[in-house]
Every structure is written in structure tokens, then in C-alpha cells.
């Protein structure tokens, strides 16, 4: 299954790579530091999530880890010659674009789906991963229906039920566009979504497939429904503006090299993203 997913993902890169580079690297005014200013400063400021295993997270000791963290550290190595020349800024889902557009960070590597509408606010690199959304339920949680006490097994079993979904997420947009009869409950974070699911406030949680699989590796009571939707190109968000063109070109050049060398594929395998 991993091999099939890797082949499919590389097909997505071939189809999307050029178009995203051309369409989403367009420029408008911004406030973030340019390449020379960043180099003079001596470190890269990167917005990331701190609770998205295996993409970006902090362990009990506060150590940063994950696929997107590895990307930021490898980018810092290319710019400054050392992996630790990066300052991680935890960011909420709803603030990912704003902190880049407002110049609070140099870029964001935070599970951001590159879309034409979002490109009005930031510029994007070509995709580094293609994600799908999925829905997870608790293994032994019955439907909340008086006349029925069977397990939730299909998406149809959730009709009329509450499903937690991250605010301003691609999963939210996709579910709202479908007529599934779900009661969508917005949450600010996955942590809030897990809390609502485990307490029975919602019957399911929708989100990035890789995030849900990561949680399932830690909790055997969670089960993924056989229903996936959407296909989202995840990309690095960078500032718009002609003055930042050299910075964007540098970042894009590194991403291109990751793709050509097979480094991205190695990282997918390392973090079990190709399963």
C-alpha cells in the first residue's frame, strides 16, 4: 500500500509541480524580511504546529520533531550551514496565513493546503506532500440513536450525528460541500477535537488522514472509517512582494532539490506518511 501511495503522490507532483510554481509564486506587497536580512539575522523564523504528530510536534521535554520540523531544519542548514538556526513559532490553524502576511515569521510550514484563494495573501512553494481527509471514530462508541446500538461503520451511519472538524481547514470546506447530513462542530485544535470525541460530545472527528493515523498508533480505541475525501497539495507559505523574490526563489530551489534527490520520499517513509 505504501508503494502505491508513493507512486500516486509522485504522479501528483508531476501534475501539479509546474502549475503551482508559476501560479502561486506571484508577488504583491508584504512586510517580511528579505533573504539578505534573514541571512544577516542568522536564523529562520518558521510558523509550525506543536501538536500535529507526525508532522510537527513537541515531546514531553519540549523537543521539536516531525516531518515539517525536519523540513525547516534542513532549510536552515542550507541557508546558514546549521540545522538549529531556526526559531519555531507555534501557530493556530486560523493564524497560519496571517503571521506570514503580517511579517511575524519568515514562512510557515504548517500543513497548509495551497489554494488560489489563499494565494491572495501569501505565496506558495510547489507541494511537498499531498494529503487527504478522513474521519475517525472511537472503536466501541455506538451511534447516539435511541433505536439502534450498533457501531458506526460507514459515513452513512454518521448522518444526523455530530462530527468535530478543525476551523478553517480543508476538511471543513470539503465536508460543507457534500450532502452527507452531518452536524459539523468547529474546533480550534485537534486537542479540542479529541477531547470532544472521547467525552462523547461528538461521534467522530474529521481531519488530515496522516494526523488521524498518527493518533491511532497511540490509541487502539480509535478507528478510521473507510471514507477518504479531498486531495490537498501541502506547501510552504511565504511572503508576497517583489522584494522577497530572492527568498522565495531560494526556498523553491531547495524544495525542487528535495524532490529530485528523493529526500522527500525518504522523509515520507521515515514518518510513515506513505502508508
Where are these regions (language model features)?
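Ligand-binding clefts/hinges and TM-proximal coupling segments of bilobed small-molecule sensing domains
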Residues: 170-185, 224-226, 255-275
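Periplasmic-binding protein-like
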Residues: 50, 130-142, 209, 213-256, ...
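Acidic, polar ligand-binding/catalytic clefts
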Residues: 73, 77, 81, 85-157, ...
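A ligand-binding cleft/hinge motif common to bilobed small-molecule-binding domains
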Residues: 95, 111-121, 174-177, 191-231
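Short, polar/charged alpha-helical segment
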Residues: 60-80
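Short glycine-rich His-centered loop
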Residues: 42-67
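Beta->alpha turn/N-cap motifs
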Residues: 47-53, 89-94, 103-115, 138, ...
